Structures are given as structure tokens and as C-alpha cells.
Amino acid sequence: MKIGLISDTHIPDRLSLLPENVIKAFEGVDLILHAGDVTDYEVIEKLEKIAPVLAVEGNMDRRFGRVDLPKSRIIKAENQKIGILHGDRLMRGDMDQLAYKALEMEVNILISGHTHIPHAEKIKDIILINPGSPTVPRSGERTVATLEINSDKVEIEFVKVWKNSFKKKQLKH
């Protein structure tokens, strides 16, 4: 199963449109997970043309009155249990807190956002992934990610999506 991972789109408050390379990056995915700060449902509608979308509420969604999204979700994909949350209620970028939250949620993969910085790390048996932001990066690169699960094999790929810089970086766990 291949899953598109996105967070912190902040449309239209930070950028008017989702970069077209996001659509290209998500070609062939079975599902898209949005880790919050959607701020405009047109983003979800556009992504749903590619694959079903599950999103969670981010701190900016509350500010923009988008309170009908859940704060977290748990799904099963292949033999993996995946949690998704924004991460704004945790210390920014604290991997130990995210790992603890994953244990609380009883998941072995946790997708989060909020930092706008792409990151993947394995702590013990828990894989933590932040896809970064395709619109407001704090790392200098506008990114999304894909997560491919084939039985016990998990591959994470970060994709740079700004203008002509469509590049992929793959990590295996």
C-alpha cells in the first residue's frame, strides 16, 4: 500500500494554491493522510481527486474555524497501525514526546506535522514521520512524503515539490 503524506498546507493564508508537483508526487497512492493545518477544504477536495483523504485538525484549522476535523486518527494499513496527529500540543520537534504519544496511541508509525520540517526517525520499534510543508517550509525545502508498506517493509520517500525542483529522497525502515 502506498500512502501520500502531507501537512501544513496553509492555503490560502500562506500560498494561494497547492503546488502542482504535490499532485505529481502523489500519483498512484492509495490513500492520502493530511497531518493538519489544512485551513481550506479546497485542498482536501483537490487531493481527493487522487485518492481518499483522511485529515486531522491543526492549530491553524481551529483559528480558521475548521473544527470538524478530529484531533487524531488511527488506521491500519497492511500489518501496520498508523497514527496521525498535528503535534502542536507537544514540544515542537521533540521526538521522544512523539514516540511516547505513539505508545499511548498504540501505533507503530506516527505521522505528525506542525514543525514544517521533513523528518523521519525510528525510535525502538516506532517510526516517526513529518512530511514537512509543501507551502511554508522551515527547512528551506517545500516537501511532501510517501509511505510505502509491503508486509513488514516500510519505505519513506520525501519529495521536494516546489517549481522545477521535483526530487525524491528515499529512506527504508
Regions found by a protein language model. Give the residues of each.
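Binuclear metal-dependent phosphoesterase catalytic core
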Residues: 6, 77-78, 105-106, 122, ...
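Non-DNA-binding regulatory cores of transcription-related proteins
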Residues: 96-105, 118
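Residue-level detector of beta-strand structural context in well-folded domains
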Residues: 72-73, 118, 145
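N-terminal active-site segment of His-dependent metallophosphoesterases
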Residues: 1-51, 61-70, 79, 141-143, ...
